[in-house]
Design a protein with these regions (language model features):
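A structure-centric signal for secondary-structure junctions around beta-strands
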Residues: 27, 44, 68-69
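Aromatic side chains
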Residues: 9, 16, 58, 73-74
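Arg/Lys-rich, positively charged N-terminal/basic patches that mediate binding to nucleic acids
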Residues: 1-32
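Residues that form or immediately flank small-molecule/cofactor binding pockets and catalytic motifs
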Residues: 8, 55, 88
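A short, surface-exposed loop/turn module that caps and links secondary-structure elements
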Residues: 35-65
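Enriched for short, Lys/Arg-rich terminal
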Residues: 21, 62-101
């Protein structure tokens, strides 16, 4: 599967990098998504779906040990994975607007 970061994801990743978050943990989660290892995504990263989005927009906790409020938002279409954003639980409320733009 091809992984494609959206512009908003790149902006939010830059913000988290400036805050000294370990972005290699994002890469580990993305590799689990690529491998379709849903068992580990559910158990370790609390994979969830945001209702009302089409195609379905998923969120996973990047690093629950360090910060349980650090989420990766993504969706899949046409055998590709689109990384939408990095954020927190407050972003879930606003993600429909960002996602549908």
């Amino acid at each position: 599967m091809e992984v494609i970061p959206k512009k908003y994801f790149l902006r939010t990743a830059k913000k988290y990098k400036k805050k000294h978050y370990d972005l290699s943990k994002v890469n580990k989660v993305v590799s689990l998504i690529e491998k379709e290892d849903f068992e580990q995504l559910y158990a370790k990263h609390k994979l969830g779906v945001i209702r009302g989005t089409h195609p379905p927009l998923y969120h996973v906790h990047v690093d629950r040990a360090y910060n349980d409020d650090w989420l990766l938002f993504y969706f899949g279409a046409d055998n590709k994975i689109y990384l939408s954003a990095l954020g927190d639980h407050n972003l879930i409320e606003h993600i429909s607007k960002i996602f549908n733009d």
